[in-house]
Amino acid sequence: MQQLEEVVASALAKIAEATDNNALEALRVEYFGKKGVFTEQMKALAGLSPEERPAAGQLINQAKEKAQNALNERREALTTAELAKKLAAETIDVSLPGRRFENGGIHPVTRTIERIERIFGELGFSAEYGPEIEDDFHNFDALNIPGHHPARTDHDTFYFNPTLMLRTHTSGVQIRTMEKQQPPIRIIAPGRVYRNDYDQTHTPMFHQVEGLLVDENISFSNLKGILHDFLLNFFEEDLQIRFRPSYFPFTEPSAEVDVMGKNGRWLEVLGCGMVHPNVLRSVGIDPEKYSGFAFGMGVERLTMLRYGVNDLRAFFENDLRFLKQFK
């Protein structure tokens, strides 16, 4: 009995002095393992008489339980202390400002497209869209562009085969609209177009917005009035605007529109003209009854003029230092 009390006292003292879970594990093996102190005590019961065994066994179990409880409590205390130490080392100062997540911005080209759509929407135009892979008829034939025209050469057009290509303008949308809708027609056609060119003012892919108005008694003065209103609204300035004669196979007469730049020089901004009678005939519209005008503008060029950008390629290089200026 006295020896058992000494065993328990020794076990409790060692458990109390343990400083980590590894030390506690060693004590568990020492006292409760297969060859542990309490295991040996239980084996020693075999040497007692049958009358003595129950009482002795009860004492050993009580001593074992006392030591086991002390071991469990110490393990829990050490685990709690270790967790508290870890949490203290990883403490977050909740009073500090959080990480700053920057909101994205609308790309300047997208801004320009949305601006153009809004202005023409206020002028009564609706936006129409069409396929970027276009056939020969909608991209060329229906627009009065003959087979010998330079625009049909491989130098300007990305061909899939002799009759299928990446569209070189959004004029095909105008043709498709006139095929399915009789006048009055009042649309713009924004979208991506493709031409085989790459330099400071050209990229193989760029954006265009083309417009079409077809109705009875439409004249060139109607065209001038619409474009004049658009340019003044787009640039938000009382600009000098001029129309000078030009040539496009799908309009007659044709003109190019210039605005006076801040440097005192004229800057070309778009092309336009009265829809050629052959174009109206190709889609089943009587040119004796209806007339119309069309216009087209490069979105990137307008964006460059509006924001003072010198190199068109900057819009497609994804340089955040450049793009953040337009947020």
From Swiss-Prot:
Keywords: Aminoacyl-tRNA synthetase, ATP-binding, Cytoplasm, Ligase, Magnesium, Metal-binding, Nucleotide-binding, Protein biosynthesis. Its EC number is 6.1.1.20. Mg(2+) binds at E252. Binds 2 magnesium ions per tetramer. The keyword Endoplasmic reticulum does not apply. Gene3D superfamilies: Bira Bifunctional Protein, Domain 2. SUPFAM superfamilies: Class II aaRS and biotin synthetases, tRNA-binding arm. The keyword Secreted does not apply. GO terms for cellular component: cytoplasm. It comes from the Bacteria. Its cofactor is Mg(2+). One of its GO terms (biological process) is phenylalanyl-tRNA aminoacylation. It catalyses: tRNA(Phe) + L-phenylalanine + ATP = L-phenylalanyl-tRNA(Phe) + AMP + diphosphate + H(+). It is found in: Cytoplasm. It holds the Pfam family tRNA-synt_2d. PROSITE patterns: AA_TRNA_LIGASE_II. HAMAP family: Phe_tRNA_synth_alpha1. NCBIfam families: pheS. This is Phenylalanine--tRNA ligase alpha subunit. It comes from Tolumonas auensis (strain DSM 9187 / NBRC 110442 / TA 4). The lineage of its organism: Bacteria, Pseudomonadati, Pseudomonadota, Gammaproteobacteria, Aeromonadales.
